[in-house]
Structures are given as structure tokens and as C-alpha cells.
């Protein structure tokens, strides 16, 4: 039996930071005196690991005791990077999170730095998977509440904004001009006016054109928008009559207005009349107490470092479990960053049918890569590597920590709205803007974005930036909303998860995140094919 086949059969739940297989506390180690322990030194994540992770820079010559191992560090180990706990021979598996993250390219001495210079991926082509279901011990917990906007169709938004949605990139400049003019309508219960520009809607074929139309329709129905102006040109492929007939379906004609620019003499004058009507309609909504079971939260990471899978991502995973225990919904995406850890998700699928859909989710993305003559493991990024992530397996095993321990209840195609409460998997790439947009399009009212490097981007919905380390949180305070780096200093995962849950309730009740305060709003549609 190959390692890939053996990995597909193994039944292992995602690790919990600070716990081993027996659910006993696994210490984060410090070599300082009692008064110097506000910054810990290293962590061995799983009892089977032959590497540990530095939680602060470790100097050459430092002597460390890691469980049964006595290690003298041979060279400087940057924060978030790995060092060997025992000699690792060339060709031997390097184990982290209890799983193989690659093979040693050369002999590595105990205490040696383990990174891209001496570690290579073990990922290859498509695999065959066997369903070995793992039961979840997640239980219901007490109700929680936030103040949201109940829409006429029963759905709940966490913002009451007016959205201008172009059907085609040709009218982007008009949409942006209208956004500026319509800011005068902001006030009272109208929280903002936002134009979501994009370059698509014409000169597209096949799946690309279909995806654009689905995304536009989903955005029109998103509950964070109290009013929507759909702005068309008139000659585009994704024109307003086609969208109405085949994609949008039923809509509230007080909430959604349409304008085709080629049909009127002065499109800005006519658009402002419609926007004023939308402002009156949206202004009639007010926040009301809503059960947290109505929340749909997207989960994404980017600019990850070696601490992302130890602090920020497990915190989000624990948050996900907490929200789901209260009847809420979370969505996990960025499929290419599941490669190498996919069986942890597959075996948590509630039914064989969901398992089969998850297999297709993974293999369809692998086929997408190979159809473009690209390798499936062309990841991590330069920033990931600088932060301590060495291979895609290393990245994926950390990335999937965001899923927590809940069973998989749904598997969504790109631009497919979420229908089932609980944990859902969504088909979308790893690209930050494209994936975050995909989460919003599928119904997320808020996106949680973990990062070890930092990024200012936004998405169509409030995007909470969660740092994996305290240095980033201090250095880029204008970007970071929540610091999970304190897990290696003075807080537990459960404590941070509860704090994050409380913060999300505050955001859902109107608190602006840093990107919103800066006025940032982005939308990026997934492009796969040719442009005419």
C-alpha cells in the first residue's frame, strides 16, 4: 500500500493546538525563567512529529528539551520555521501535524533548520479515496444574538447598504461616478453606497460567462444590500433582460432597480433618481435582534506563515464549531490549499454522497491545474515560505484547521448559494480576492481572513483580518482586526475563539472592520477560460 493510499484510509481528527491524541494538555515550551515566559519558544504540534516549530527566533547553539529529545540548534531558526527533533535521513518523511509534509532532500541533523532547501513535496497526481467516516462530538450550545436587518424574503443582513452592480465592465466608470454622487444618501439607516466594478460580462464563453451571470445574480440577492441598482450597457452578453429571464428569478422591485445606459439620454441623471428611491426604501429598515443561527460566515486564509496553522486557523476552527453549535453556518473554501489534507475533510462528510462530492471538489481542481499544464503543488507563495511554510502539504494541513471539528453538511459549486446550515465546503481557488468574493456570493455576510503577513484587501462583505502573530498585529494595526498571536503568549484557543465569536457578533451588529473604515470594498470573479 502506498503512502497516499494509507493516508486516505487513516482516521485522524484535525489536531487541537495544545492537545495530544489523549486530549491531554500539550505544553508550548519556554526555556526562559518564570518572569520571561510572556513569549514561548517552540511547539511540537503532534506526538508523532519529527520537527518542532519555533515560536520566536532561536539562536544557533541554544539547547532545547522537546519531550524526550535533547536538541542543540545548529543554525538560526526564524519564528514560524521548523527544526528537526532527531536526525532525518535523505528520503525520509518529515512529519508535522501528525502527517507527512514532504520528504527530506538531504540528511538533516537533529536541531537543523527544515525548510525549502532540504524538504520537497510528496504530492503527485489524482488519488483514489476511501470513505472512513469520523463521528463528530459537537453538541448544541446556548443561543446567542446580534442586531441585524431582516429582509422581506426572510434572510438577514449585517449591513444596510446600497449596491451598484454593473453587468459589464464597460460601465464601471459610470458606476464609480454614481457611487461618489450617491454618498449624499448615506445617513440614518443607510450605511453606505458601494459600486462593485469588475471587467467581465462580455467577451466571455462557456463556464466563465455562466459564472459571471451567477455571481451577478447572487450579489443582487445578497441580504447585506438594502437596495440594489443593476447598471447595464445594453449590448453585452450578460445583459439585463437575460439576467432577469434566466438568473435573477423573483425579486422585490422596490429593493432592486435596473438601468440600461444605452436606453436613456443621461444615464447618470436617471440613475440618481433610482438611487434616491432605493435610499428611501433601504432607509426604512432598522436593526432588530436576530438569533446567531442566521449567521453565515466565510473562512479564508492568505499571506500565511508558520504560525497560521498553530494560532489563527485553529482559533477560527474553534469559532466555527462554536457558531455551528448554536445553529449557524460556516463556509470553507480555497480548494488547492486542501491538497494533502483533503482526507481530514472527506472523512468528516456526513454522508457517502457528500464524500463523493468532496472527492470531485478536489479532483476537479487538480484536473483544472493539469488541463493548463500546471503542477498541482505550485504553492506556497514566496511570502508563505519566508514565514516558515515549506510545502503545499505543510500549508494545507494548517489551512484546514479553519474547519474545526464539525461534520461537513454541504459541498457547493462555485457561485452556488449555501442551502444547509453547518459546515460547507465551497469550490473556489486560493486567490484571496477571488475566494473571499466567492464566499460572499454563496451567502456569507462576513468573511474571516487569517494572515501571517498582512493584507489590506476587502471583499463585498465585512472582512475580518486575523493575525497569526502579535508582531503583525502591532505593526499593521490599521489592517488587523483581531490578534490570534496571543495564543503563544497568554491565551488558550477556546478563550480566543470566544473572544472572536463576541467580536463577530459586534461586527454583525454594525461595528466596522478596519477595511470598512478605510473605505475598501473589492469584488473579483473567477476567470478560467479565454477572452474573445
Predicted regions and their residues:
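Short, compositionally biased terminal leader/tail segments enriched in small/polar residues
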Residues: 4-5, 29
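Short, Lys/Arg-enriched N-terminal segments with co-localized hydrophobic residues
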Residues: 15, 19-38
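Metallocofactor- and cofactor-centric catalytic cores in central/energy metabolism, strongly enriched
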Residues: 39-416, 420-446, 456, 462-532
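Short secondary-structure boundary segments
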Residues: 451
Amino acid at each position: 500500500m502506498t503512502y497516499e493510499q494509507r493516508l486516505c484510509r487513516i482516521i485522524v481528527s484535525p489536531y487541537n493546538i495544545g492537545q495530544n491524541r489523549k486530549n491531554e494538555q500539550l505544553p508550548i515550551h519556554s526555556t526562559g525563567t518564570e518572569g520571561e515566559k510572556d513569549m514561548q519558544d517552540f511547539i511540537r504540534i503532534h506526538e508523532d512529529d519529527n520537527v518542532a516549530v519555533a515560536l520566536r527566533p532561536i539562536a544557533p547553539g541554544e539547547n532545547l528539551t522537546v519531550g524526550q529529545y535533547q536538541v542543540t540548534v545548529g543554525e538560526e531558526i526564524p519564528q514560524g520555521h521548523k527544526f528537526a527533533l532527531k536526525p532525518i535521513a535523505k528520503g525520509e518523511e518529515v512529519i508535522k501535524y501528525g502527517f507527512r509534509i514532504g520528504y527530506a532532500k538531504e540528511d538533516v541533523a537533529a536541531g537543523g533548520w527544515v525548510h525549502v532547501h532540504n524538504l520537497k513535496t510528496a504530492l503527485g497526481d489524482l488519488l483514489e479515496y476511501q470513505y472512513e467516516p469520523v463521528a463528530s462530538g459537537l453538541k448544541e450550545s446556548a443561543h446567542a444574538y446580534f442586531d441585524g436587518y431582516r429582509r422581506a424574503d426572510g434572510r438577514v443582513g449585517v449591513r444596510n447598504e446600497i449596491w451598484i452592480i454593473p453587468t459589464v465592465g464597460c460601465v464601471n466608470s459610470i458606476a464609480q461616478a454614481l457611487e461618489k454622487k450617491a454618498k449624499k444618501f448615506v445617513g440614518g439607516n443607510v450605511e453606505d453606497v458601494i459600486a462593485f466594478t469588475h471587467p467581465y460580462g462580455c467577451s466571455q464563453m462557456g463556464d466563465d460567462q455562466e459564472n459571471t451571470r451567477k455571481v451577478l445574480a447572487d450579489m443582487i440577492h445578497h441580504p447585506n444590500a438594502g437596495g440594489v441598482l443593476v447598471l447595464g450597457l445594453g449590448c453585452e452578453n450578460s445583459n439585463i433582460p437575460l439576467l432577469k429571464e434566466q438568473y435573477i428569478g423573483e425579486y422585490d422591485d422596490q429593493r432592486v432597480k435596473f438601468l440600461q445606459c444605452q436606453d436613456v439620454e443621461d444615464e447618470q441623471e436617471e440613475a440618481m433618481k433610482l438611487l434616491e428611491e432605493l435610499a428611501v426604501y433601504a432607509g426604512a429598515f432598522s436593526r432588530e435582534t436576530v438569533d446567531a443561527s442566521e449567521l453565515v460566515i466565510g473562512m479564508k486564509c492568505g499571506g500565511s506563515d508558520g504560525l497560521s496553522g498553530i494560532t489563527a486557523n485553529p482559533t477560527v476552527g474553534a469559532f466555527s464549531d462554536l457558531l455551528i453549535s448554536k445553529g449557524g453556518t460556516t463556509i470553507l473554501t480555497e480548494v488547492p490549499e486542501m491538497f494533502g489534507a483533503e482526507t481530514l475533510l472527506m472523512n468528516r462528510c456526513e454522508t457517502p454522497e457528500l464524500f463523493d462530492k468532496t472527492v470531485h471538489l478536489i479532483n476537479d481542481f487538480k484536473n483544472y491545474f493539469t488541463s493548463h499544464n500546471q503542477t498541482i503543488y505550485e504553492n506556497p507563495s514566496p511570502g508563505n515560505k519566508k514565514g516558515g511554510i515549506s510545502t503545499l502539504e505543510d500549508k494545507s494541513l494548517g489551512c484546514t484547521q479553519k474547519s474545526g471539528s464539525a461534520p461537513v453538511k454541504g459541498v457547493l459549486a462555485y457561485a452556488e448559494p449555501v442551502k444547509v446550515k453547518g459546515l460547507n465546503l465551497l469550490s473556489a481557488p486560493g486567490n484571496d480576492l477571488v475566494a473571499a468574493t466567492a464566499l460572499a456570493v454563496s451567502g456569507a455576510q462576513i468573511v474571516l481572513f487569517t494572515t501571517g503577513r498582512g493584507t489590506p484587501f476587502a471583499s463585498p462583505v465585512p472582512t475580518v483580518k486575523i493575525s497569526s502573530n502579535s508582531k503583525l498585529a502591532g505593526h499593521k494595526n490599521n489592517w488587523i482586526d483581531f490578534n490570534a498571536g496571543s495564543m503563544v503568549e497568554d491565551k488558550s484557543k477556546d478563550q480566543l475563539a470566544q473572544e472572536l465569536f463576541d467580536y463577530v457578533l459586534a461586527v454583525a451588529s454594525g461595528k466596522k472592520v478596519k477595511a470598512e473604515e478605510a473605505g475598501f470594498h473589492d469584488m473579483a470573479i473567477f476567470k478560467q477560460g479565454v477572452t474573445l
